[in-house]
Amino acid sequence: MGRKQNENEAHGNSAKYDPSFRGPIKNRGCTDIICCVLFLIFILGYIIVGLVAWVYGDPRQVLYPRNSTGAYCGVGDNKDKPYVLYFDILSCAAAINIISIAENGLQCPTPQVCVSSCPLAPWAVEVFQFSKTVGEVYGERRNFCLPAVSPDMIVEESLQKGLCPRFLLPSTPALGRCFPLPNINFTLPEDLRINNTTVSNGISGLLDSINARDVSVKIFEDFAQSWYWILVALGVALALSLLFILLLRLVAAPLVLLLIVGVLAVLAYGIYHCWQQYQVFRDKGASITQLGFTTNFSAYQSVKETWLAALIVLAVLEGILLLMLIFLRQRIRIAIALLKEASRAVGQMMSTMFYPLVTFVLLVICIGYWAVTALYLATSGQPQYIYWASNTSTPGCENVPVNMTCDPMAPLNSSCPNLKCVFKGYSTTGLAQRSLFNLQIYGVLGLFWTVNWVLALGQCVLAGAFASFYWAFHKPRDIPTFPLSSAFIRTLRYHTGSLAFGALILSLVQIARVILEYIDHKLRGSQNPVARCIICCFKCCLWCLEKFIKFLNRNAYIMIAIYGKNFCVSAKNAFMLLMRNVLRVVVLDKVTDLLLFFGKLLVVGGVGVLSFFFFSGRIKGLGKDFENPNLNYYWLPIMTSIMGAYVIASGFFSVFGMCVDTLFLCFLEDLERNDGSQERPYYMPKALLKILGKKNEAPTGGKTRKK
């Protein structure tokens, strides 16, 4: 007895009875004010970064292609010309990179022009046509020349100056650019030395992009055909999730028992199977001494020692689980009772089930703001132009300052006939451009901090609502009228700083994990096993640290929602309270995880099976208006429905999990604060009182507990 008391004292003193305590404290003050001020200053800086990015950035260089002069195709004067045509795409196709072109502009040493449509048929200028005019030779194809070319210009002169293309290839638009189509037979003049094989080899790096475009079109068509059925599947997932949670008050005990028996049965079958395999290989005399060491791990399945080791491991797990059932059965009953009470709490406050929608909207705002800011920062800078000549060996072009900067508005006073001032890219010499890396790092920190703050806000708000349910002595009479909105306003008003403190700690650990993942990716080709081992150990340690901080933050937010203390005090009190009841914590955590995993499996699996049978045509539609959609890839709406069902189930069950954790901490506080007397009655439900062998004294003289 003395030893147990010393252990409890090592984990802090039990909560003392407070006659004024009636649930989440209403008269509270602001907590972690310094962190709140720092967070608000950081958000202000984040907004300034966004404004700087908006002023200097130009995302059009990613969204729209550009011609040789740097003008955008598809906007402004080129609104009706959304595609860019390369005069000689084979001169750059070998080193082309679609994403690089989208981000950096001109990458090919060939003129580019905005066009309304891509060429549909092969065509080329014959040698005998060089002396004719552009209007005579090109005709309607003159729109593929640069706008400045005159129809009376001689063709040979226009080709020397790079004003018109010598040939056209059948092309398809992809990412706003005209790319030649592969595997199409055509013939061009022999002096060009261009044929179907040359084009196919030259644009081999672009074929995947073209194919990807075709696939993307088919995917879009499938979504257009099946979007309403996907919404139906998501509605089924929502209904199943809500129904599962509400029915837990009725089926929690048999369901948990069924799951535990199922785990025991699976382990028992594993032991039986391992024993059978062990006997087979023992009779054959297959031993590891005969096999020796090998890197072919599948070979170890053919030796008796492998199956014996697996048998021992499964037998140990089976024994541990049986011992837990025997010695921790009362704690399992407590966990089941808390699950039932959580289901009851959710039923009394149905609005809490839809709070994840608020979290989702806030997360979309945070992630969207970061993405737009990062895009604008990445595209900041002033356009730069350089001199370029298609053939520097032409008479008069020997001393041309190629690659030197120029002004596109200034006249070209040069003897070189094909000299041009073309767009090169965007400068990196401005203030915003020199600080680009630092601003992007600031944005990444802002992303992690704001996202974690939004998640912390949701946890604290839900904890405040569910705590008001537990500490209502007469349910539902004593439950506040608007518990969720009251908790939301209370959290924002008093505890923004505390949430920011916890979110910052978690964000720093997550950023460290991202940096380690990047280093590990860079060292993946390294042959240094020591460095790889060290990185792996650091990753493992940071993963464990992140899990612990998430667990600590979650319980700290519950204590903040109830008592209104600062983050450090709340985290300490929550940790000490849990350490004084560590066995109950472990049992409740595992039982809840098992139950919620089964719930997710039920929802996602049910929606997945129904989607598969419907979209694959195995279930016919209900009448003419509800026919099965004709799809290119029937697995696409199936996977979309499954992922959507998982997101919905995770959102609903995260609320339920927060409810269980909140009620559990309140239950532990209730045990320490109260003793069941008239002055200090227990707030827990009768089922928990019965399991613990406790009861509240009946009020005498018709007295009832004051609110």
Swiss-Prot record:
- Residues modified by carbohydrate are 67, 185, 195-196, 296, 391, 403, 413
The highest taxon in the source lineage is: Eukaryota
Q: Which residues lie on this side of the membrane: Cytoplasmic?
A: 1-32, 249-250, 329-356, 474-498, 579-594, 657-707
Short name of any one Pfam family annotated for the protein: Choline_transpo
Keywords in alphabetical order, please: Antiport, Cell membrane, Glycoprotein, Membrane, Transmembrane, Transmembrane helix, Transport
Mind telling me how this protein is modified after translation?
N-glycosylated; N-glycosylation of Asn-67 and Asn-391 is required for a proper thiamine pyrophosphate uptake.
The record's annotation in InterPro entries points to: Choline_transptr-like
Q: Where are the transmembrane segments?
A: 33-53, 228-248, 251-271, 308-328, 357-377, 453-473, 499-519, 558-578, 595-615, 636-656
- Cellular localisation: Membrane; Apical cell membrane
* One GO biological process term: thiamine pyrophosphate transmembrane transport
Q: Which residues form the signal peptide?
A: none
Quick one: a GO cellular component term?
A: apical plasma membrane
What is the catalytic activity of this protein?
A: choline(out) + n H(+)(in) = choline(in) + n H(+)(out); thiamine diphosphate(out) = thiamine diphosphate(in)
Pull the Extracellular topological domain ranges from the record. 54-227, 272-307, 378-452, 520-557, 616-635
Q: How does it sit in the membrane?
A: Multi-pass membrane protein
Molecular function (GO) terms for this protein are:
antiporter activity; choline transmembrane transporter activity; thiamine pyrophosphate transmembrane transporter activity
Entry comment describing in which tissues the protein is expressed? Expressed in colon and cecum.
Q: What does this protein do?
A: Choline transporter that plays a role in the choline-acetylcholine system and is required to the efferent innervation of hair cells in the olivocochlear bundle for the maintenance of physiological function of outer hair cells and the protection of hair cells from acoustic injury. Also described as a thiamine pyrophosphate transporter in colon, may mediate the absorption of microbiota-generated thiamine pyrophosphate and contribute to host thiamine (vitamin B1) homeostasis.
Family indicated by similarity: Belongs to the CTL (choline transporter-like) family.
Q: What is this protein called?
A: Choline transporter-like protein 4
Species source reads: Mus musculus
